[in-house]
Amino acid sequence: MKHALASADKTKLAIDIINLLVKKNQDILVLIVVPTEVLKDQWFEKLVENNLLSNCKIEIINSAVKTPQVVDLLIIDEIHGVPSEHFVKIFEVIKYKLLLGLTGTLERLDGREALIKKYASVCDKVTIEEAEKNGWVSPLKEYVVMIKTDLTEYNELNKRFNAYFSYFGWDFQTAMKSVQDVFFRRKWCKENNLNFKEATAMTYDWMRCLRLRKQFVQSHPKKIEIARKIINARKDKKILTFSATIADAEKIGIGLVLHSKQSKKQNEKILEKFKTQSSSVLNTSKSCDVGVDIPELECGIILSVDSSKIRKGQRYGRLCRFSPGKKAELFTLIIAGTQEFGWWRNSKTSSNYVIIDEEQLDDILAGNEIQSRKIDDNSNINFRF
């Protein structure tokens, strides 16, 4: 399995491998499995460019997992998405001689990447730094903007959250299972001699505080304000924003909005319009995390942070896709003094970042040099909520 930066052109690597195999055996059959229609279309274009359609076919995993096939080489793009009870059957349904898995970030929050490793060990890993050094990606600098604001509401939510969380012995899995599964909750109450009605109230109060606390940091109005400031200072750039929700993406109010509530045809038109403009803004929630190829992107703004290395790697990859002479910027907006910084630290995939405040942001946007700082790269935060 190839473990590489999302934008280090995993597709090109796979195409090179297919070409080598075809030279040795012109009758070789390759099945390429992808998670989305967008990626299927991108692969099709690459296969046409390289005259490989006679040896290869592409299927979306939802369909591929239902149809037994025999192939010489099975390629699974974005293989980190396979470890579900349904999709993992792909390894049994498809009979293959060789397996190539492609991913930008294998590590998952649920640890289920271990299931993938049963079928495919990591054969190579390309870091962002190595990819940049070899000219496979464009240089990208991340600015982590620490935003100061009134935390009275957050601190009150945090206090209540911790009070409810202590009821579950500070065990995140127990608390979350109690929310999701009433049968688990009943069993847990019985085993611990707890009142079911009281446990139910604690469960939903804990979940409510968890949601409100996350909403406070990820959808804070000051992030919208600062995102607009960055956009106005980079009017000559192609800019992609990542928000927590569709509503937040729409609140930015500058440029285009791409989201799942619009029809596929509408989104295709919006994306095509954005691609053809020399400078523009595309606001998204999660719709551009995977499968969007816009090498001309020069600026990204992340308004919504979580602990996922996969999501961070995907978003990083959107920005540093290679384009001659390009130097990209990524602005990650964080509410200072909250757990959001811990989420960012757990998700970071590169050492090429600086931590700045709002005054330093103004200097950067004006093109001035700044004194910056980094955190200890060996430090670790074990909790993710």
Predicted regions and their residues:
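Conserved two-lobed SF2 helicase motor
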Residues: L52-L73, V82, F274-V290
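A short beta-strand element within the Helicase C-terminal
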Residues: D72-L74, N283, V290-D306, R311-K312, ...
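Conserved helicase ATPase core of P-loop NTP-dependent helicases/translocases
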Residues: D41-E45, K238-F242, A247-V292, R311
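Post-DEXD/H (motif II) to motif III coupling segment of the RecA-like Helicase ATP-binding lobe
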Residues: S84-L140
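Conserved Walker A/P-loop ATP-binding site and its immediately adjacent core
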Residues: A6-V22, Q26-L47, H86, I246-A247
